[in-house]
């Protein structure tokens, strides 16, 4: 059976120190366990909330981290921020504003001073993920950080919406 084969291959990959895993027949890069759990939790929350667009963006962020031979680092940052922006728009019921505008209009959506960290994340993503300049390439670990923080923020915002 395919699930058993997938499980056995993943165990083998771990035992051999191979940084890959098989997920639903697709080979993906293995990320740090805490990042994997954060993304998985966010994906489930988004699925249950019916936020398919944000879920798709988060999935694309993960796929971009897994691309080989070179990860699409800027793509992962862009998709992670897009997921966060999509959820923020939905929770704020403001479907036209950018994430930067939403953060200014709804400063209490994320409690201070945590809201400042999201503003800084937005700035980082704008600088390194969207409007990248020659010689200023983000690192893989920075992309993982952005994806993880966005996944956690998405989970928080969906929870806030459901209160």
Predicted regions and their residues:
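Alpha-helix capping/termination and helix-coil
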Residues: 65, 69, 84-95, 129-132, ...
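Long, charged low-complexity segments
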Residues: 36, 97-163
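Internal, Lys/Arg-enriched amphipathic helical interaction segments that engage polyanionic partners
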Residues: 1-56
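Solvent-exposed, amphipathic alpha-helical segments
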Residues: 56-67, 121-131
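Short, hydrophobic, well-ordered secondary-structure elements
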Residues: 55-62, 73-92, 151
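Short, solvent-exposed segments of well-ordered alpha helices
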Residues: 45-48, 52, 67-74, 112, ...
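Short, well-structured alpha-helical interface segments that form or flank functional binding sites
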Residues: 53-56, 71, 75-82, 97, ...
């Amino acid at each position: 059976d395919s699930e058993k084969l997938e499980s056995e291959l993943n165990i083998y990959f771990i035992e051999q120190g191979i940084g890959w895993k098989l997920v639903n027949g697709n080979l993906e890069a293995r990320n740090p366990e805490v990042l994997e759990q954060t993304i998985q939790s966010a994906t489930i929350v988004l699925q249950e909330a019916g936020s398919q667009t944000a879920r798709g963006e988060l999935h694309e962020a993960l796929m971009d981290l897994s691309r080989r031979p070179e990860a699409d680092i800027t793509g992962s940052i862009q998709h992670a921020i897009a997921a966060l922006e999509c959820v923020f728009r939905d929770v704020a019921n403001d479907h036209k504003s950018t994430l930067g505008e939403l953060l200014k209009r709804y400063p209490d959506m994320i409690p201070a001073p945590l809201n400042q960290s999201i503003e800084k994340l937005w700035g980082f993503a704008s600088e390194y993920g969207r409007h990248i300049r020659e010689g200023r390439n983000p690192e893989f670990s920075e992309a993982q950080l952005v994806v993880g923080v966005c996944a956690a923020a998405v989970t928080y915002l969906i929870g806030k919406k459901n209160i």
